[in-house]
């Protein structure tokens, strides 16, 4: 058996119904569209979200909130990640080269999540109060 020779079982596939090809077919003349009206015409149907002139739901509800674009340039790094990284000195460039933060990232903050078991010297990176205490307890420093 070859993949290109596999065929469906006889009678398993039905031919597509061809509409508008004479009254003997059962779907001639109006082709299943009924008589008159917008939906019977070519190109005749409302746009998505149109409610017949009633104020649409999307406009009835109030605007709310926004997505800060500055978040695209910020990133967080955990203590566990720093521990796995294996570098003695860490800055934003080192994190980018290690692939821990994206290329567009400008601001990095270390958060206290997990544990740090070795000394790490941070420079040009923000830290939370808990993370700073954990880094200094492990013999590291924050510049």
UniProtKB/Swiss-Prot annotation:
GO molecular function terms listed in the Swiss-Prot or TrEMBL record: rRNA binding; structural constituent of ribosome
Keyword RNA-binding: yes
GO cellular component, one term: cytosolic large ribosomal subunit
Keywords: Ribonucleoprotein, Ribosomal protein, RNA-binding, rRNA-binding
Comp. bias regions, Gly residues: 21-31
Organism: Verminephrobacter eiseniae (strain EF01-2)
Known partners and oligomeric status: Part of the 50S ribosomal subunit.
NCBIfam families: rplO_bact
InterPro entries reported in the protein's UniProt record: Ribosomal_uL15, Ribosomal_uL15/eL18, Ribosomal_uL15/eL18_sf, Ribosomal_uL15_bac-type
Gene3D superfamilies attached to this UniProt entry: 3.100.10.10
Keyword Amino-acid biosynthesis part of the UniProt annotation: no
Biological role stated in the UniProt entry: Binds to the 23S rRNA.
Descriptive protein name: Large ribosomal subunit protein uL15
Similarity field: Belongs to the universal ribosomal protein uL15 family.
Organismal lineage: Bacteria, Pseudomonadati, Pseudomonadota, Betaproteobacteria, Burkholderiales
Pfam families according to UniProt: Ribosomal_L27A
Example GO biological process: translation
Signal peptide: none
Region (Disordered): 1-56
């Amino acid at each position: 058996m070859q993949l290109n020779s596999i065929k469906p079982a006889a009678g398993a596939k039905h031919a597509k119904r061809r509409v508008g090809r004479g009254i003997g077919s059962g779907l001639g003349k109006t082709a299943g569209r009924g008589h008159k009206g917008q939906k019977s015409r070519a190109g005749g149907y409302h746009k998505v979200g149109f409610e017949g002139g009633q104020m649409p739901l999307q406009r009835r509800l109030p605007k709310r909130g926004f997505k800060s674009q500055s978040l695209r340039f910020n990133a967080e790094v955990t203590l566990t990640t720093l521990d796995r990284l294996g570098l003695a000195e860490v800055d934003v460039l080192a994190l980018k080269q290690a692939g821990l933060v994206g290329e567009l990232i400008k601001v990095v903050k270390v958060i206290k999540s997990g544990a740090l078991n070795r000394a790490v010297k941070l420079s040009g990176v923000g830290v939370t109060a808990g993370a700073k205490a954990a880094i200094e307890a492990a013999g590291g420093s924050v510049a």
